[in-house]
């Protein structure tokens, strides 16, 4: 089997010599006189390749005795030698069209041999090789949203479920019955039970993924609240805040307001290094722990915490926008996402921690923690989601309708924003005094930075996933300096919207996303402050998002700050935030980015 290879018949090609290497197997025509017809057959079947990598093979199985077709040509048709009955086995792999980006396509290679034992030997050997791919999941918890998008959740799962079954991946499927179902399940799940799974999959949109994310992190992410500027006042008694938060966790009952907004709280002990790289935090590596039902050290089971080197999240897109999937895979395709999960692809993903201090100006200080994977937005972004709740019967079209209604109101909001400035960060670093008179006083940088787009095997994301110091040397574009005391910069006035993009947020309406050069795992937020401006100017700004290659952030009323943390204060009574499409009522929040806090079943976008 090794070395020179063995003669087999390949369906649609003919007799070939198959050789096994360290990373895959390859085949060549056995007879030179028929090589041209073999390869012309492969050319006519673009899904076939002459080499199969084990990293792309997700299953192999024996078939019943049946026909193995020779390559099609006129002579074979005349002679009637198209099909030959023999023992067979099939290799299930993936292929990609040569034009990129493009979806992944399942592909079958059917091999035949006269001897049944030879086929069995090949099957067992290939199984042994693909089982060495250690990153592949064995057991997954799957949440299916039956009503997301246009009701595609259940249908999409029915489409991809056979792929998981064929790959021998066990799945525990839960069809959600109500809002907060996934959150409640994961927040209440014991670590002992969670350790039975290699990951959690959302068959739905960004909202379901956000619910799963918050359910997992609410009691399993240990870190402090975001840093706040001097004068914000809520960290004067930090231990009291943390104690209040821990008490909330021990009760773990949802208030009515919290249930409406993806319920949850987070257990985070005091830590004086809130911007510490998450890769240096102490999290449990599930792959190195005992996954049996037997408890360790008496009755205690090792805690599951995040960041976590093994546990991963995944999305099979079925929502209205699917911005997270498009930003992390480049394809809004359920089959592609399913194959990425089955093959165990992995990337790290930044997560924004959002702490609501007050729900309204008259409310008492009561810190509540939420997490967002793609975007946190106020003003226009929040009002669109709130307005759309009235028109759920319209389906995905409600977002266009609500967006138009909110846009025509052209409402602005008085607010103050403070963000951490880093020395090399490209931003409009105007002071609060300079901004007091409005747009005209902003100092706009005409020479905008060179965009470095995040993609598969992104060097910036790979570099920042190791250590902060190394990332600085390896990635000059990561906009990080070794400043020990980052400076807080205030910006205040009337804003149409305030948004923080964790990732690019690509979607079908915005092909480049909100921030084209946002990275998946560089530890930064992209703070977007849209100041009050005439309605036609705002329309011009919004339409730029729909054009690939445009620069919607180049307007003078737009501030773009790349930062690790920011604080927001508003005096508006009904202030609402949009967190990955979910509502959170809050007039005072602080937000920070956690680098690579979770791992995703994805490989990055091909752009």
UniProtKB/Swiss-Prot annotation:
Functional note: Catalyzes specifically the phosphorylation of ceramide to form ceramide 1-phosphate. Possesses activity on ceramide analog (C6 synthetic ceramide) in vitro. Ceramide is a critical sphingolipid metabolite that induces programmed cell death (PCD) in plants and ceramide-1-phosphate has a PCD suppressive effect. Thus, ceramide phosphorylation plays a role in the modulation of PCD and CERK activity is crucial for the maintenance of cell viability.
A Pfam family recorded for this sequence: DAGK_cat
UniProt motif CXXXCXXC: location: 454-461
Domain annotation DAGKc: ranges: 135-358
InterPro entries per record: ATP-NAD_kinase_N, CERK_C, Diacylglycerol_kinase_cat_dom, Lipid_Phosphate_FormReg, NAD/diacylglycerol_kinase_sf
Active site positions, chain numbering: 206
UniProt biased composition (Polar residues): 276-286
A molecular function GO annotation: metal ion binding
Gene (UniProt): CERK
Catalysed reactions, as listed in the record: an N-acylsphing-4-enine + ATP = an N-acylsphing-4-enine 1-phosphate + ADP + H(+)
Binding site for substrate: 204-207
PANTHER family attached to this UniProt entry: CERAMIDE KINASE, SPHINGOSINE KINASE
Field pH dependence: Optimum pH is 7.0 (at 40 degrees Celsius).
Protein name: Ceramide kinase
EC number: 2.7.1.138
Superkingdom field: Eukaryota
Gene Ontology BP terms: ceramide metabolic process; negative regulation of programmed cell death
Tissue specificity field: Highly expressed in leaves and at lower levels in stems.
First-level EC class: transferase
Region feature Disordered, mapped onto this chain: 247-297
Effect upon mutating residue 454 to A: 26% reduction of activity
Family annotation (Gene3D superfamilies): 2.60.200.40, Probable inorganic polyphosphate/atp-NAD kinase, domain 1
Cofactor(s) of this protein: Ca(2+); Mg(2+)
Record-level GO cellular component terms: membrane
Temperature effects on activity: Optimum temperature is 40 degrees Celsius.
